[in-house]
Amino acid sequence: FFYFFLNFYFIFGDYMVRKNQEWPDEGELIIGTVYKVLNYGAFAKLEEYHGKEAFIHISEVSSGWVKNIRDHVRENQKIVCRVLRVNPKKGHVDASLKRIREDQRTKKIQHWKIEQKAEKFLELSAKSLDKSLNDAYEEVGYELMDIFGDVYGAFETAADDGAKSLTDEGISQEWADAITEIA
């Protein structure tokens, strides 16, 4: 169990993939980094939602009895968890580690890896236009998410169908050419 998460941490490092919304939805799978472990639960910074954090109560750490929470989660550990409740007014996100099947965890990790690649591709596209990654997200990244579902989908479409497929969706010719060149 610990070995899995240790590998997960070294694979992903501290690279952040962005989401187009401010708060996660209830039931959504999220990726976080545990930064504080207490006797009654753990706090994790959400990787996809900049500046947001989630609380995992000790009763949501494992389906079995938890004698010592540190046997299940450690600081700086990357975790995949399910959102139970979101309260934007209080700034709270409650999450669960135990309400996820292994296949869901694996699928989320694979999607995370793909989106990290896509973000790197977007960064390379931005550099070819002498722009920053933040500029890329503001100008085209969030729009690509709305149109294609995620940034990687836009790069797949550009690789398969060329820059015209992006311009037909309303992406500027400048960005369409840069994305197609990288794809």
What are these regions (language model features)?
Residues Y3, F8-A183:
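Single-stranded RNA-binding regions, centering on S1/OB-family and related RNA-binding modules
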